[in-house]
Amino acid sequence: MENEPDHENVEQSLCAKTSEEELNKSFNLEASLSKFSYIDMDKELEFKNDLIDDKEFDIPQVDTPPTLESILNETDDEDESFILEDPTLLNIDTIDSHSYDTSSVASSDSGDRTNLKRKKKLPDSFSLHGSVMRHSLLKGISAQIVSAADKVDAGLPTAIAVSSLIAVGTSHGLALIFGKDQNQALRLCLGSTSVGGQYGAISALSINNDCSRLLCGFAKGQITMWDLASGKLLRSITDAHPPGTAILHIKFTDDPTLAICNDSGGSVFELTFKRVMGVRTCESRCLFSGSKGEVCCIEPLHSKPELKDHPITQFSLLAMASLTKILVIGLKPSLKVWMTFPYGRMDPSSVPLLAWHFVAVQNYVNPMLAFCRGDVVHFLLVKRDESGAIHVTKQKHLHLYYDLINFTWINSRTVVLLDSVEKLHVIDRQTQEELETVEISEVQLVYNSSHFKSLATGGNVSQALALVGEKACYQSISSYGGQIFYLGTKSVYVMMLRSWRERVDHLLKQDCLTEALALAWSFHEGKAKAVVGLSGDASKRKAIVADRMVEILFHYADRALKKCPDQGKIQVMEQHFQDMVPVIVDYCLLLQRKDLLFSQMYDKLSENSVAKGVFLECLEPYILSDKLVGITPQVMKDLIVHFQDKKLMENVEALIVHMDITSLDIQQVVLMCWENRLYDAMIYVYNRGMNEFISPMEKLFRVIAPPLNAGKTLTDEQVVMGNKLLVYISCCLAGRAYPLGDIPEDLVPLVKNQVFEFLIRLHSAEASPEEEIYPYIRTLLHFDTREFLNVLALTFEDFKNDKQAVEYQQRIVDILLKVMVENSDFTPSQVGCLFTFLARQLAKPDNTLFVNRTLFDQVLEFLCSPDDDSRHSERQQVLLELLQAGGIVQFEESRLIRMAEKAEFYQICEFMYEREHQYDKIIDCYLRDPLREEEVFNYIHNILSIPGHSAEEKQSVWQKAMDHIEELVSLKPCKAAELVATHFSGHIETVIKKLQNQVLLFKFLRSLLDPREGIHVNQELLQISPCITEQFIELLCQFNPTQVIETLQVLECYRLEETIQITQKYQLHEVTAYLLEKKGDIHGAFLIMLERLQSKLQEVTHQGENTKEDPSLKDVEDTMVETIALCQRNSHNLNQQQREALWFPLLEAMMAPQKLSSSAIPHLHSEALKSLTMQVLNSMAAFIALPSILQRILQDPVYGKGKLGEIQGLILGMLDTFNYEQTLLETTTSLLNQDLHWSLCNLRASVTRGLNPKQDYCSICLQQYKRRQEMADEIIVFSCGHLYHSFCLQNKECTVEFEGQTRWTCYKCSSSNKVGKLSENSSEIKKGRITPSQVKMSPSYHQSKGDPTAKKGTSEPVLDPQQIQAFDQLCRLYRGSSRLALLTELSQNRSSESYRPFSGSQSAPAFNSIFQNENFQLQLIPPPVTED
């Protein structure tokens, strides 16, 4: 039995009173649940199923009575199962093809039968699960079917039913009954070909539970009942259902007197068999009428005899599948509908499928219904509550990537699915994992298409049912007792689950030993799927599988040695064994068979030296992870020798520290470790092998002490040794084993005492006369003072209640002081580390150490020595750490401050001042410290802004900052400005008075006022007076005059008049002009600029011949450009007279130098000035009418008397510009006309093109429009390609009223994927913006070719709303600002007067022209390419 989650939250009680709408709503809610939640819960339940009975088809056991357990475990047949044989080929080519359509889709392409072969399984599922199904041909039955067709004209097989016997129906009305014994003999041949000629082919078969009766349904509608014991015909039923329809299904229920049949009319009938006074009768009752929806699949719930008392069986449930929904009804005690479940949209050609099976959910056995159509399988659990009501719970979805034509339960965990291309898929139901895929095209499966089309009665069935029948094979597949039988046109095949041994052996036969071991291990761990044949509890099952795995491992080892390549490079052999040997090691260790691994397997693999080496290397990861202990001495010795021979000494060291080396030669291992510098391994061997902890220290000290005492630099190797020594000492003093693990508890005190005694030795064992006292502590202090003291500090943490340890602690401290204080070999940093260590120890509340205070005074004098400037920062940092560690209590604070100030230890001063809350003095510390002086700003800001300081403290800091403001500004002006803006905003004028240096004041004001400096200051909150801003502007004029204009553009809060006076004072004429323009005095600003221009021109005029890059000429050009820009900025706001007052003086100023004689002006400057004058003319042409310009030039006294030679170039340039603009306008107009012509041609081609529908059937009713016979219905084709009957479209309410006319909208486009789009389209249509694209036309058979009205209707082409919509889209596509502006320009009515160039009209200059529009953009692009 199996456990599954019972989803109470989606459970729905379904009863007869429940309306179909409520049922649909409840199941739609259930369908929204994610399938993944079910998968996850099933995976959890899978691991709880431990017990599997070998009589089961892999149904896990639960805590229920044995009788309930056996219900799901026993096979249905009582007879001994027949022996299956391997598939063989039959010589059946002589059979004539029959008129009935019973051949499979795949059989038509099968070709020569001798080429049929079984399809290979998918590699992934095969390697993971092996071959799950056994696929065999029933030779005896297949041969007799072929023989019957040949000798007695039985016809081709059409249906099969299996119980204790196998019944096969034929196309000529015979029912062949075969035994399920080894011989597969023909027991009975029921019926005759004459009756078959009258009734037609057998279309359905059913055998009752005790295998005593057989029901046969025929293609022409008759039903017969046979006694399988005697072969007698008991009943011939001809009036059970309406005539003219074939029997599609006939099913016995658990009640032998009750059967259900389903005909090709879609109706379902209940058949009740009675025997009154020796007369056998049959009463028929219609359960479901085909007029309400055609049922094409029925499945009654069958229960085994052991489940006869199940509360569900008394209802005699029947599941029916129509083309639109699923129904579950109860036949007893009275007819009642328990559930309806609609399908939803799906492929109309897919086959509805139903299948029942009893499963165990939460220790209760209940029936589960699987139903599917297409590629989704739904599972419904049916159960009864205490009140007697039936509840149906949606369990899960099974989403597939193929369409199903058959669904079969093989047991409660495993299902077998057949898809539309005749591939079998074995699925684990709980995890939805596909275990195997098998192709069965060689079966040549029989299909029931002819019966669904009811060809024997004239084909009077609906097209929908006929379409489903194309793939129907209900009667060709039958399951019984965990076996599935497949009926082919000339054979019968059977499939069943392989036992676990067969699956493993199947892989072994295919030489897949690795996969076989992996599969066997999954059986061992209980993670395999579809397991058959394992019995007993978990330990018994594991033992059985383990024995089989050991056999495979021996075979695997022999194969590894035999398959070894005899020749070739050694790398080839190594690769071979690296692929094979790790598998043996892995599975031996997984099975916890070290005895097998290190005896038989090792001995076997040792025959080959390469295999032996690979074997030893495979042990390494298990040893390093401590998963392999207890290695035999021989293997351990071989392992070390192997790695040593391969020069892998680091690996040897890593292995030794994880091994039990007591069985090895200790001295030999130590010698090897020392020679190869394996210090960790050496220490481990001493500790574990000899319980010796001091000898490793002595060996390491002998190496690192001499160079340290000599003052030499240690090598990298010696540094590594020193670090290992420190860690080793730390571990010993902490009770930890080195390099891993713990020292045995009984040895911890002894080891600590030994290590302390060793460290405090006065002299070493082999001391020389020159050796200083306490050599070991001295060596460690020289090696790494800080780390050695850290080791001691960690050790002292444990010295709380141990009196002897406390004595050791004091003794070591005294030795440290004696060694370091009385010796000058140590640096200040090292001495400081010692006293910091001591200060921390003395500061502890439970301190027991005693240190003379005068030693701290000596250290203070040493660190603050003013005579020694070396290592200043180091000395200061050491003293600071000492104070922070609690050493301050050892000093007199006033003396400490004096010495710190004298030594310029400003961080020490800050530390002391902060303790006394003298924050203002800390500012001096920052300002005097060159390394930290810029941090003073953040410090002042934090004191003044962060809460926690008193008002007096803040005031003292504020005043101190104010006193040093000039120093702060000189240090960092922008930071000082930000500080002032934040904390001194009300005292800015005081700050300015304190800044006597004008350069500093300028930098400060620029940082404060110029937003471009990047400081984050809110100018509104500052409330700076205009006087300060003007003071800054004046300083700016002095120190950086070139930046005045740019600064004025971003500055605020200054007075124009006063600022103008400042700029005039410093003769900054451009700035003055800018301010006058800002003031509104345009003429005044212009006069200043004009005066500057004239002065520049005068300089050029009086200069001699110069180079082309004359700076004076460049000044003229720059000044002229600025003057032009001034005129252009302000001309829009001036009248014509005021514009002329600006532009004409500028023009005269530029032309004045040209009036002089040519000898007065260098030729080079003459050409340059003419070019600049032309630039002025081009600029003023946008604001001054061209006739006015010419008139002003001609009125000049110089040119008015006929001297036009000097200005000939200017006039010709103006005319060239006019010609260019006129040509540009004509070209643009031509391009637009061509573009418009092309667009209209393209539009005309688009709207007159015919529509090509995507399909030839209505997208709503799915019927071809040519076959519809009801009425002369119109066909509507949309531009999207969808086609509809107008009647279908009208039923879907896809019409919109628009200006009194009915307009259509495409149903699929507006509602299928675009929710709410139809309503939006309706509103758009009513507003006249869009129109649905459609073409109405009548079918050809509804209209006469010579209909004059049709010709008249097409004589006048008129744009319909669809074409208007297309035209609007085209206009929007090619719409642009420049083209619209140009079209507007061209569309204006022009009189001959206004259109004449150089007309004398002054009142309407070309200000409205597109050429005067600054936003006008001409976009010239080729037309887009379209497909024809």
Curated annotation (Swiss-Prot):
SUPFAM superfamilies: RING/U-box, WD40 repeat-like, YVTN repeat-like/Quinoprotein amine dehydrogenase. The keyword Lipid metabolism does not apply. One of its GO terms (molecular function) is zinc ion binding. It comes from the Eukaryota. A zinc finger (RING-type) spans 1258-1310. The modification Phosphoserine is found at residues 26, 32, 127. WD repeats lie at residues 195-236. Pfam families: Beta-prop_VPS8, TPR_Vps41, TPR_Vps8, zf_RING_Vps8. Residues 1330-1356 are annotated as: Disordered. Disulfide bonds: none annotated. The keyword Glycoprotein does not apply. Keywords: Endosome, Metal-binding, Phosphoprotein, Protein transport, Transport, WD repeat, Zinc, Zinc-finger. It is found in: Early endosome. Interacts with RAB5C. Interacts with TGFBRAP1. Component of the putative class C core vacuole/endosome tethering (CORVET) complex; the core of which composed of the class C Vps proteins VPS11, VPS16, VPS18 and VPS33A, is associated with VPS8 and TGFBRAP1. This is Vacuolar protein sorting-associated protein 8 homolog.
